[in-house]
Curated annotation (Swiss-Prot):
One of its GO terms (biological process) is sensory perception of taste. Residues 65-67 form a propeptide. Guanine nucleotide-binding proteins (G proteins) are involved as a modulator or transducer in various transmembrane signaling systems. The beta and gamma chains are required for the GTPase activity, for replacement of GDP by GTP, and for G protein-effector interaction. It comes from Mus musculus. This is Guanine nucleotide-binding protein G(I)/G(S)/G(O) subunit gamma-13. One of its GO terms (cellular component) is dendrite. The gene is Gng13. G proteins are composed of 3 units, alpha, beta and gamma. It is found in: Cell membrane. The modification Cysteine methyl ester is found at C64. Belongs to the G protein gamma family.
Length: 67
């Protein structure tokens, strides 16, 4: 590790204190909640629900052509 001067060390300590203050939760709890949130949003997500893409006027209708 390279030599650090005092301001760099202070910034590093400040950053570590900031990270330590974050509220953390167990992955075993948050991952199922995230999956449920994603699954609940599928009917409203135009990228996952092709019927919603049909109503979007900005979607390109033509396919790409390779020259």
């Amino acid at each position: 590790m390279e030599e650090w001067d005092v301001p760099q060390m202070k910034k590093e300590v400040e950053s570590l204190k900031y990270q330590l203050a974050f509220k953390r939760e167990m992955s075993s709890k948050t991952i199922p909640e995230l999956l449920k949130w994603i699954e609940d949003g599928i009917p409203k997500d135009p990228f996952l629900n092709p019927d919603l893409m049909k109503n979007n006027p900005w979607v390109e209708k033509a396919k790409c052509t390779i020259l």
